[in-house]
Amino acid sequence: MSLKFARILGVNVTIENEENILEETRKYFLKSEIPRLIRGRRNPKSEKKSINPLIIFTPNPEIVVLAQKDDEYKRIVNSAQINLPDGAGIIWAVNRLEKVKIRRVSGADFMLHLVKLAEEKALTIGIIGGRGGLAVEAIECLQKTFKDVKMEALGEPEIDTKGGQAIDSENYFQNLKNDIDKRKIEILFVALGFPKQEYFIENIKIQISKSKKFRPIILMAVGGSLEYISGRIPRAPGQMRRAGLEWLWRLARQPWRIRRQLAGGEFFIKVLMTPNKKLLF
């Protein structure tokens, strides 16, 4: 991919506008269309060629702080082809350290863009995670707007992780990969919260990569986006989102997030202590 990144405290952050990032996802599916034809015949070499899953994460200050303390987690986050700049803290850090002004790319909004893309290209979407039937509720809400999209809930797994490895779950991921193949899922949204969802995506990516099949799939960590989409939690007003205060809105409705905000304070201090360097690549 040709997207530009900045490295913030060792974590890659995509520094492109939303449309450029979305265009890369379109290109991913365009390059992967099968079967490829040569003079009206299938090209067996193309059909045998495998393609890597396209990984999309949404690193926020808390994720960056954890990545600094956990090298394996940092490796996983940095392995993503797209790391959306979702959050005022990340935008501020990129501006301060890289002297680059970028706009926020909301993970929840980008998820909706991918659902629209799925409708345009007749792709099948899978959603995994969310508690108490949240994925099913989100699908019902999405299908009111995107009536022609095929979407399926794939369960609410309780997968423990340690050091980047899923515990006693190899069979689960193998079965999940088989289920993804059977249902022909081409976009998989994982809503397990960090860091579990990033570890989860790494494990399913490994299983998918083993198959060596020429079939594209996007794996995106969507965190709390299902709560917004389902209507369980109202989104902050547009003015608050534009001002970078959506975190305050969520904190007021979910006080348990205070521990995460403390990690955000640690991020703020570390950025202030980091010399300004241009680390674009």
Regions found by a protein language model. Name each.
Residues K184-F194:
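Proline-aspartate-enriched helix->loop->beta-strand connector
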Residues M1-I38, K48-D109:
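N-terminal nucleotide/polyanion-binding subdomain common to many enzyme families
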Residues N60-V64, L192-Q197, S225-L226:
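Short glycine-rich anion-binding loops that position phosphate/pyrophosphate groups of nucleotides
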Residues G89-V94, R235-F281:
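A transmembrane-helix-recognition feature enriched in membrane-embedded lipid enzymes
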Residues E156-G163, S211-R253:
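Short, flexible loop segments at boundaries between secondary-structure elements
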Residues I91, N95-L176, R183:
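Conserved beta-alpha
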Residues I139, E198-Q207:
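Short Gly/Thr/Asp-enriched flexible loops that form oxyanion-binding sites at enzyme active sites
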Residues M1, K31-L37, R41-I51, K144, ...:
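Short, basic, low-complexity termini and linkers enriched in Ser/Thr/Gly/Pro
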